[in-house]
């Protein structure tokens, strides 16, 4: 894909990803909104980072993956669950789910999370030991109610269960980084080599996630009786300098 082609990945949502899933001109990474350069060769590192926070999948555990997409990362995590003799439930559009393997340990639930019909199905499953939502929250932030999403997802955890809301683009973090010496060098090298990054303002658009959103979610979860943490990404991940994770634990 050319640089101009990536304009189609700006201001997108659930229905757009359904179309991407059916577009054979896109690679698996592009179908989920990523240039190949942002994901190729990183799958093992990402899984290691996930497991450092969620823990390794153990035999008999129930796992929920919200918005897995169709890339090799999703397939690798499904295989890891299979090898660990654990069941994984996948929630995404039918078009995306059709691109993922049908295996004995896989339950596919097509639809938009957290719609009422999806939640009715998931609430009948008895809860989950691990919930992962990777690189999806910034779309849900626009299309769903943040607090409803958080509350309903926390309700699905078993005692001792963990929910990792991961790979969140935090524009406060991004601005802090780009206004540092190292960040300015990164900006000039990878973002725009023709224009110096001299913006010292921490401007924020209404559809962007900042520190306030993430800290607010942490406080809400803690006030509901859950442990909650802001977690850095491993320095071997492609966007660790401007993305971070939230980890929620049910005592």
Q: For the regions a protein language model found, what residue spans apply to each?
A:
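Conserved class I S-adenosyl-L-methionine
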Residues: 60-69
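C-terminal alpha-helical "lid/dimerization" subdomain adjacent to the S-adenosyl-L-methionine
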Residues: 169-221, 232-235
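N-terminal, positively charged/glycine-rich alpha-helical extensions of SAM-dependent methyltransferases
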Residues: 1-31
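Class I SAM-dependent methyltransferase SAM/SAH-binding core
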Residues: 69-117
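A short, conserved alpha-helix within the catalytic core of class I
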Residues: 140-152
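Conserved beta-strand signature within the Rossmann-like core of class I S-adenosyl-L-methionine
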Residues: 160-168
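A conserved beta-strand element that flanks and buttresses the S-adenosyl-L-methionine
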Residues: 132
């Amino acid at each position: 894909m050319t640089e101009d082609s990536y304009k189609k990945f700006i201001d997108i949502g659930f229905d757009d990803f359904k179309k991407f899933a059916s577009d054979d001109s896109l690679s698996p990474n592009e179908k989920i909104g990523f240039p190949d350069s942002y994901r190729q060769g990183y799958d093992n590192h990402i899984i290691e980072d996930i497991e450092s926070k969620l823990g390794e999948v153990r035999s008999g555990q129930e796992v929920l993956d919200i918005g897995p997409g169709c890339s090799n990362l999703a397939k690798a995590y499904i295989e890891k669950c299979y090898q660990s003799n654990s069941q994984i439930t996948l929630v995404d559009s039918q078009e995306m789910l059709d691109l993922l393997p049908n295996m004995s340990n896989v339950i596919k639930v097509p639809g938009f999370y957290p719609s009422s019909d999806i939640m009715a199905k998931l609430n009948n499953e008895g809860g989950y030991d691990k919930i992962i939502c990777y690189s999806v929250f910034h779309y849900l932030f626009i299309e769903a109610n943040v607090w409803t999403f958080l509350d309903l997802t926390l309700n699905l955890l078993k005692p001792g269960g963990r929910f990792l809301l991961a790979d969140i683009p935090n524009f406060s973090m991004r601005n802090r980084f780009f206004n540092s010496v190292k960040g300015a060098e990164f900006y000039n090298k990878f973002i725009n080599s023709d224009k110096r990054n001299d913006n010292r303002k921490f401007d924020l658009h209404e559809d962007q996630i900042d520190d306030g959103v993430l800290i607010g979610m942490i406080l809400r979860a803690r006030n509901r009786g859950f442990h909650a943490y802001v977690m850095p990404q491993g320095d071997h991940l492609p966007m660790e300098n401007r993305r971070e994770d939230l980890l929620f634990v049910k005592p």
